[in-house]
C-alpha cells in the first residue's frame, strides 16, 4: 500500500489562506488563537475527509512565517490589491476568501519567498482553482503575474 502525500509547503499555504479567511470573518479575532486552532486541525486530521493512505502535514514554520508576514505587511498588501482593481468599489465588494488568498499569495511573492515567482503563482492559482470560481481564478493568476513582472520577479 502506497502513501500519498502533498507537499508540506502547499498545505501550509492553504492553511495560511484559511487562517486569514477566518481572521476576516471573525473581525480580526486573535490571530494566535486562530493559528493554534488550524494547526490542531491539521495535526489531528479530524475534520479532513481523506482516504486512510493519504497523509496531510504542513510545514509549521512556513505557515507561521506566511501568517506573520501578512500581518506585518497587511496595509501594504491591501494597497497593492486595491491598486490592481479596475474599480474602487471592487475592494469593498471583494469576496473574503479572494482577499485572504490574495493577501497570502502577494505576501509570499514579494516579502518572504525564496521560492521562484512562477512556483508561487502556480501554487496559488492551484489553490484558487480549488476554492474560487472561474473568474476569480483568472483574476488571481493575472494579478500575481502582473505583480511579479512589476517587481522584476519574472521577465
UniProtKB/Swiss-Prot annotation:
For whether the record's keyword set contains Signal, the answer is: no
Look up the record and report any one GO term of the cellular component aspect.
Answer: cytosol
Q: Note the superkingdom of the native organism.
A: Bacteria
Task: Report any Pfam family annotated for this entry.
Answer: NusB
Gene Ontology molecular-function annotations: RNA binding
Q: CDD domains per the record?
A: Terminator_NusB
GO BP annotation list: DNA-templated transcription termination; transcription antitermination
Entry keyword set: RNA-binding, Transcription, Transcription antitermination, Transcription regulation
**Classification via InterPro entries:** NusB-like_sf, NusB_fam, NusB_RsmB_TIM44
Q: Which Gene3D superfamilies match?
A: NusB-like
Fetch the NCBIfam families from UniProt: nusB
Q: What is the annotated role of this protein in its UniProt record?
A: Involved in transcription antitermination. Required for transcription of ribosomal RNA (rRNA) genes. Binds specifically to the boxA antiterminator sequence of the ribosomal RNA (rrn) operons.
The family note in this entry says: Belongs to the NusB family.
Q: What is this protein called?
A: Transcription antitermination protein NusB
Amino acid at each position: 500500500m502506497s502513501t500519498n502525500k502533498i507537499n508540506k509547503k502547499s498545505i501550509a499555504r492553504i492553511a495560511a489562506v484559511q487562517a486569514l479567511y477566518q481572521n476576516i470573518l471573525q473581525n480580526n479575532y486573535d490571530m494566535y488563537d486562530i493559528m493554534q486552532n488550524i494547526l490542531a486541525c491539521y495535526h489531528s486530521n479530524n475534520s479532513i475527509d481523506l482516504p486512510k493512505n493519504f497523509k496531510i502535514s504542513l510545514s509549521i514554520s512556513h505557515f507561521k512565517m506566511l501568517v506573520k508576514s501578512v500581518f506585518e505587511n497587511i496595509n501594504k498588501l491591501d494597497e497593492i490589491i486595491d491598486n490592481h482593481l479596475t474599480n474602487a468599489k471592487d475592494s469593498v465588494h471583494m469576496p473574503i476568501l479572494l482577499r485572504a488568498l490574495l493577501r497570502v499569495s502577494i505576501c509570499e511573492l514579494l516579502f518572504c519567498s525564496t521560492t521562484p515567482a512562477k512556483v508561487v503563482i502556480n501554487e496559488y492559482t492551484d489553490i484558487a482553482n480549488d476554492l474560487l470560481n472561474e473568474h476569480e481564478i483568472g483574476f488571481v493568476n493575472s494579478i500575481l503575474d502582473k505583480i511579479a513582472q512589476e517587481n522584476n520577479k519574472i521577465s
